[in-house]
């Protein structure tokens, strides 16, 4: 299946900047191949304007479900008296997969984030057989959050492709090693750390974003 879910350990982990980097990488190194981007569902203010302004029509992007309140989807939907029709999301994904060589799916919250009253993002990733990258912010507490999210992923049988460490602020190599020690995380989770995304002040610098992703030797988007 030609799809990759970008999930995270929590909200504000940097999924959008990592996803932007993956888009920039794909467009730079695989310009002849079509790329689609899907926001699984959006609550509150979204990133659609960000992506559209940055890639200016070069990217097929869809957001099947949107809710106004910046809350967990079932809570936001309840406030509006609406349902969460996952069938609509699934059909939108199938349609995008048919027309694109690769579809990047930006998730929401952590893998334990509820997408309905019964299902979490991890449930959805497993049921829809989505290969998943886990974005981990470089900060205090990241190790325990990573272990917990991957334990949930294993319980739900999510196809985890690996971990991306993301710097939300400028970090030295020593800080990265102390806050998110790669060997320790890999030992505790049996999940590979594929790369580190450094803090980039200008998130519109697509060449720099693409070069970061290109420096991760284990990332092979063309083989998904």
UniProtKB/Swiss-Prot annotation:
Self-association or partners: how does it assemble? Homodimer.
A single BP term in Gene Ontology: biotin biosynthetic process
Q: Check the record and name the SUPFAM superfamilies matching this protein.
A: P-loop containing nucleoside triphosphate hydrolases (SSF52540)
Location(s) in or outside the cell: Cytoplasm
Q: Which UniProt keywords apply?
A: ATP-binding, Biotin biosynthesis, Cytoplasm, Ligase, Magnesium, Metal-binding, Nucleotide-binding
* Pathway annotation from the record: Cofactor biosynthesis; biotin biosynthesis; biotin from 7,8-diaminononanoate: step 1/2
Q: Enumerate the Pfam families for this protein.
A: AAA_26
Return the similarity comment.
Belongs to the dethiobiotin synthetase family.
Q: Which reaction does it catalyse?
A: (7R,8S)-7,8-diammoniononanoate + CO2 + ATP = (4R,5S)-dethiobiotin + ADP + phosphate + 3 H(+); (7R,8S)-8-amino-7-(carboxyamino)nonanoate + ATP = (4R,5S)-dethiobiotin + ADP + phosphate + H(+)
The residues responsible for catalysis, as annotated, are: 39
Name the NCBIfam families on file: bioD
Question: Needs which cofactor?
Answer: Mg(2+)
Q: Name one GO molecular function term.
A: magnesium ion binding
Extract one GO cellular component term from the record: cytosol
Which positions does UniProt annotate for ATP binding? 12-17, 47, 106-109, 166-167, 198-200
Can you tell me which residues bind substrate? 43
Q: What is its EC number?
A: 6.3.3.3
Q: Does the keyword Kinase apply?
A: no
| Organism for this UniProt entry | Microcystis aeruginosa (strain NIES-843 / IAM M-2473)
Q: Give the protein name, as stated in the record.
A: ATP-dependent dethiobiotin synthetase BioD
Quote the function comment for this protein: Catalyzes a mechanistically unusual reaction, the ATP-dependent insertion of CO2 between the N7 and N8 nitrogen atoms of 7,8-diaminopelargonic acid (DAPA, also called 7,8-diammoniononanoate) to form a ureido ring. This cyanobacterium does not encode bioA (which catalyzes the formation of the precursor for this reaction in the cannonical pathway), instead it encodes bioU, which replaces bioA and also performs the first half of the cannonical BioD reaction. Thus in this organism BioD has a different substrate.
């Amino acid at each position: 299946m030609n799809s990759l879910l970008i999930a995270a350990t929590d909200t504000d982990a940097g999924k959008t900047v990592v996803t932007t980097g993956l888009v920039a990488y794909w467009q730079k190194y695989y310009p002849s191949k079509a790329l689609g981007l899907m926001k699984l569902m959006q609550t509150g203010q979204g990133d659609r304007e960000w992506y559209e302004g940055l890639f200016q029509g070069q990217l097929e992007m869809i957001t099947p479900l949107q809710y106004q309140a910046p809350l967990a989807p079932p809570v936001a939907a309840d406030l509006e008296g609406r349902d969460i029709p996952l069938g609509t999301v699934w059909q939108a994904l199938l349609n995008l997969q048919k027309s694109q060589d690769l579809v990047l799916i930006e998730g929401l919250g952590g893998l334990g984030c509820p997408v309905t009253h019964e299902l979490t993002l991890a449930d959805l990733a497993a049921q829809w057989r989505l290969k998943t990258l886990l974005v981990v912010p470089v900060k205090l507490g990241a190790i325990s959050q990573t272990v917990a999210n991957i334990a949930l992923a294993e319980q739900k049988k999510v196809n985890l492709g690996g971990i991306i460490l993301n710097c939300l602020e400028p970090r030295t190599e020593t800080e990265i090693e102390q806050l998110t020690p790669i060997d320790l995380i890999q030992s505790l989770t049996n999940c590979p750390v594929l790369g580190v995304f450094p803090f980039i002040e200008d998130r519109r610098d697509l060449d720099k974003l693409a070069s970061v992703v290109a420096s991760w030797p284990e990332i092979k988007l063309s083989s998904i």
